């Protein structure tokens, strides 16, 4: 076998079906859309969730809950990520954004205990989980709530 003799295996490549190009093709005239009606027209078809005039499911089901306008969403940082920093570094929200660990501070930063920490760091954040606080202090570091 030579490079110029390479061919795709049989049935692995399918030519696209061009519709509306003559009746001999089997897909001419109506282009596989049948005769007239909403689905034969351009842009035709029903909107998402439409059930033919029957009351749709999303309207039959009762409303639930609400959006709390006072909700605070914290950017989450796990312990294993903090190992990137050198020993003795002061980890602040600004530093976390700068290094690309988090995209933005949101309502603050919460440190969670996923993974383990080997470095001695001073971590400044808005919230700490109890296990994360324990782990940072066990590694010889400090936690500071801001």
Swiss-Prot record:
Coiled-coil ranges (or none): none
SUPFAM superfamilies xref list: Ribosomal proteins L15p and L18e
Biased composition (Gly residues): 21-31
Highest taxon listed in the record's lineage: Bacteria
GO molecular function, one term: rRNA binding
Keywords: Ribonucleoprotein, Ribosomal protein, RNA-binding, rRNA-binding
Record field: transmembrane: none
PROSITE patterns (UniProt xref): RIBOSOMAL_L15
InterPro entries: Ribosomal_uL15 (IPR030878), Ribosomal_uL15/eL18 (IPR021131), Ribosomal_uL15/eL18_sf (IPR036227), Ribosomal_uL15_bac-type (IPR005749), Ribosomal_uL15_CS (IPR001196)
Keyword flag Nucleotidyltransferase: no
Region Disordered: start-end pairs: 1-50
Protein's job: Binds to the 23S rRNA.
HAMAP family referenced in this protein's UniProt entry, alphabetically: Ribosomal_uL15 (MF_01341)
UniProt subunit comment: Part of the 50S ribosomal subunit.
Protein name as catalogued: Large ribosomal subunit protein uL15
Naturally occurring in which organism (per UniProt): Listeria monocytogenes serovar 1/2a (strain ATCC BAA-679 / EGD-e)
């Amino acid at each position: 076998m030579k490079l110029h003799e390479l061919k795709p295996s049989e049935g692995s490549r399918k030519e696209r079906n061009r519709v509306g190009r003559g009746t001999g093709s089997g897909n001419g005239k109506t282009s596989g859309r049948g005769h007239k009606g909403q689905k034969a027209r351009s842009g035709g078809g029903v909107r998402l969730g439409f059930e033919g005039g029957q009351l749709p499911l999303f309207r039959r089901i009762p409303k639930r809950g609400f959006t709390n306008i006072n909700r605070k969403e914290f950017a989450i940082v796990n312990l294993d990520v903090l190992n990137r920093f050198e020993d003795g570094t002061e980890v602040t929200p600004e530093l976390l954004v700068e290094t690309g660990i988090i995209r933005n501070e949101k309502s603050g930063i919460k440190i969670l205990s996923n993974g383990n920490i080997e470095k001695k760091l001073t971590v400044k954040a808005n919230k700490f989980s109890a296990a994360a606080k324990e782990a940072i202090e066990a590694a010889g570091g400090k936690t500071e709530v801001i």
